[in-house]
Amino acid sequence: MDPKVNVVPPALHLVDPQIQMTITRMEDAVVHDQNNAGPKVYPIILRLGSQLSLSMAKRNLDSLEARAFQSTPIVVKMTKLATTEELPDEFVVVTAK
């Protein structure tokens, strides 16, 4: 098994790694694909908290301080299940406000 496949920063508390959301605001997506107008779909990692906000992150950056940037709120909808093995380099992190 590839050790890089299931890497999750320990600061992220997994509630359910099998949840996926669809980003419906393309300007907030990490991947800037101007040729594709359809919504990008990224697996998400849930963090414990009553209120939720979205931020984008790259899992392959070295430090937690460098890995994330805040985005404006993103309109999302639940889609099909995804496992942590399917996480791309860019994924959505849901954090408590």
Curated annotation (Swiss-Prot):
It is a peripheral membrane protein. Residues 8-97 form the 9b domain. Keywords: Host cytoplasm, Host cytoplasmic vesicle, Host membrane, Membrane. PROSITE patterns: SARS_9B. It is found in: Host cytoplasmic vesicle membrane; Host cytoplasm. Its main location: host cell. GO terms for cellular component: host cell cytoplasmic vesicle membrane; membrane. Coiled coil: none annotated. Homodimer. This is Protein 9b. The lineage of its organism: Viruses, Riboviria, Orthornavirae, Pisuviricota, Pisoniviricetes.
